[in-house]
């Protein structure tokens, strides 16, 4: 099973992936080549994303998925949906060169690549189990920004749960998004 973990910054995604692998050692972590590209090319992230960086990250996320096959036991710390959410935020805020045309170029790639994911676990911000925000590597620590990203994920997750529709995934062949 190919599992993706998604959500805003500082919500415990990597911790969940690490704990999951300890509990179920037959699962492997994806290559996460996008992290290497971010570091190697010093790509802009979070509030400073731009088309060039988001395009490179999206393609790395897709490449990692394409290296797998149906039946592989792999867990992804982030997926193309994450990339699209961050791009949507930037387009909405008009904080960079990311525009509607760029979003429209990305959506078909996200739709196609998400078909290869069997299930998406979304880790939302909750009052019941708050996660301490820690400065680490390229992590964003602006609480308002983190909440705004979380809200975009929640709209996607709740809309899909209520209507069965998600404009960023194909209708007939998409993974469920399960909020945990």
Which residues does each predicted region cover?
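Walker A (P-loop) ATP-phosphate-binding motif of ABC ATPase nucleotide-binding domains
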Residues: 2
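Conserved substrate/cofactor phosphate-moiety recognition/catalytic segment
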Residues: 21-63
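A basic- and aromatic-enriched beta-loop-alpha substructure that forms the phosphate/nucleotide-
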Residues: 58-101
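Hydrophobic anchor at the beta1->P-loop junction of P-loop NTPases
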Residues: 5
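A glycine- and Lys/Arg-enriched "phosphate-lid" helix/loop adjacent to the NTP-binding pocket
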Residues: 86, 90-161, 172-175, 179
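Walker A (P-loop) phosphate-binding loop of P-loop NTPases
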Residues: 10
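Conserved lysine of the Walker
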Residues: 13
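Hydrophobic positions on the alpha1 helix immediately C-terminal to the Walker A/P-loop
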Residues: 16, 20
């Amino acid at each position: 099973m190919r599992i993706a973990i998604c959500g805003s910054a500082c919500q415990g995604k990597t911790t969940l992936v690490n704990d999951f692998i300890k509990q179920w050692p037959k699962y492997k972590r994806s290559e996460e080549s996008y992290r290497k590209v971010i570091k190697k090319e010093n790509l802009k992230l979070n509030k400073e994303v731009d088309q060039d960086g988001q395009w490179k990250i999206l393609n790395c996320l897709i490449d990692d998925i394409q290296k797998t096959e149906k039946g592989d036991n792999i867990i992804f710390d982030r997926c193309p949906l994450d990339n699209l959410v961050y791009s949507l935020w930037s387009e909405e805020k008009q904080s960079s060169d990311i525009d509607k045309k760029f979003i429209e170029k990305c959506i078909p790639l996200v739709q196609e690549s998400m078909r290869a994911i069997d299930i998406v676990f979304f880790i939302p911000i909750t009052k019941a189990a708050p996660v301490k925000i820690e400065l680490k590597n390229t992590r964003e620590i602006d609480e308002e920004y983190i909440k705004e990203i979380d809200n975009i994920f929640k709209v996607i997750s709740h809309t899909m749960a209520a209507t069965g529709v998600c404009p960023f995934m194909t209708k007939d062949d998409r993974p469920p998004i399960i909020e945990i």
